[in-house]
């Protein structure tokens, strides 16, 4: 299920499938670890959706920590919201808390870095 360009993962299998898809396509992943009872999560959620529209080259995923506890534990999520940025299956950065400016800056910087890196890679023969 998607809201904007954000895909909500409702199963561990779905999570792993989406993460693998991002790895296979060499895309940066932005994950919103959230909870339905978390007030700040509800405030920052629409910002995450807007960022997904602004940066379609990034894979945006949403994980409810109560629904997918194993995934939250695997990524050491201790507070909500936590935004983790993943490249090639490894965490490269994160933002903890509903910090709109920090989140927007981080996504923009990582998107620019990903674009620059891809542009400077030699072409595959």
From Swiss-Prot:
Annotated compartments: Cytoplasm
Protein name per the record: Thioredoxin H-type
Pfam families from the UniProt entry: Thioredoxin
Disulfide bridge positions per record: 38-41
GO cellular component terms given for this protein: cytoplasm
Domain Thioredoxin: 2-112
Keyword Ligase: no
Residues annotated as site: Contributes to redox potential value: 39-40
Annotated function: Participates in various redox reactions through the reversible oxidation of the active center dithiol to a disulfide. The H form is known to activate a number of cytosolic enzymes.
Protein family membership: Belongs to the thioredoxin family. Plant H-type subfamily.
InterPro entries attached to this UniProt entry: Thioredoxin-like_sf, Thioredoxin_domain, Thioredoxin_H-type-like
Site entry (Deprotonates C-terminal active site Cys), positions: 32
The species this protein was found in: Picea mariana (Black spruce)
Residues at the catalytic site: 38 (nucleophile), 41 (nucleophile)
Keyword tags: Cytoplasm, Disulfide bond, Electron transport, Redox-active center, Transport
Designated gene of the protein: SB09
